[in-house]
Amino acid sequence: MKQQILDILVELEKWRAERKLSTESQREGYIRNVMEELGELAEAIKTNSEHEYIDALCDIVVFAGNCVNKEKFDEAFIPWETMEESFVNLHEDTLLKSMFANASEMTHSPNISIASLYSFCKDLAAKKGYDFFKCMKEVLKQINSRTGAWNEDLKKWVKDTSPKAKSKEYQADFDKCKLN
């Protein structure tokens, strides 16, 4: 799991660099942005939409990962490795509550929280039959294909939703991320 998270953090670091964003700028709007994604997750649960559910989990990890300095991640990960296995058999409701609590801790200790948040999301995706790392790679392809601009009021990168931009945007294909 550690290498998967590091791979994601490297991709997010490239994404931020291309857009001249910093982890600090990402932390400023984190709570509002992740709350929006949690709302999308709740809607996906309500409507039983698997793809929207997976997309919301991935977006939560994207927002969280954009708050993390990958150089400091290594030292924070060591204590988490010993606890990860104990979460695999938790009920989905417990995982969701734990993920929500952990997502709100990102602003205080992002380098530790990303490991637990990723683990919760990975387990939630697995319960729906998806390989979360493959899903994350699909979402990273999608966000890398987007154009847009930083919105200072929202404290986030806002994608261009024009028809031209939408026609060029890669769409994450979660069907190829199913567990065997």
Task: State what each model feature region is.
Residues 1-180:
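Flexible "arm" and connector segments at domain edges
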